[in-house]
Curated annotation (Swiss-Prot):
The organism of origin for this protein: Mus musculus
General function of this protein: Acts as a mitochondrial iron-sulfur (Fe-S) cluster assembly factor that facilitates (Fe-S) cluster insertion into a subset of mitochondrial proteins. Probably acts together with NFU1.
InterPro entries: BolA, BolA-like_sf, Mt_Fe-S_assembly_factor
GO cellular component: iron-sulfur cluster assembly complex; mitochondrion; nuclear body
Protein's recorded name: BolA-like protein 3
Keywords carried by this UniProt record: Mitochondrion
Family: Belongs to the BolA/IbaG family.
Quaternary structure annotation from Swiss-Prot or TrEMBL: Interacts with NFU1.
Highest rank taxon of the organism: Eukaryota
Location of the protein in the cell: Mitochondrion
BP terms from Gene Ontology: adaptive thermogenesis; energy homeostasis; glucose metabolic process; iron-sulfur cluster assembly; response to lipoic acid
Amino acid sequence: MAAWGPAAAAPLLRGSRGLPLWHCAQRMFASQTEGELKVTQVLKEKFPRATAIQVTDISGGCGAMYEIKIESEEFKEKRTVQQHQMVNQALKEEIKGMHGLRIFTSVPKC
């Protein structure tokens, strides 16, 4: 029985995330996706004192799952769960269209 798709023609080498290596290479050098830009913009508006914001689409480019790293003075003296709640609240509209979200928050070091 013949399989459908390009994988049927030649075996694909897969990277650590299970994606074809050519896809990983394309994504590594590509600029931010539309979804990454949108989430970054919302976070910049909601956390104007953030010293670092990094948004990465970890779903392979389809926009279903993101990893967010944000460093902001606004997280000072808040527990991790409270920091994550702040990020979730800021992105409540965007989250409706996502499958998952990884959040890493921190406070700038003096």
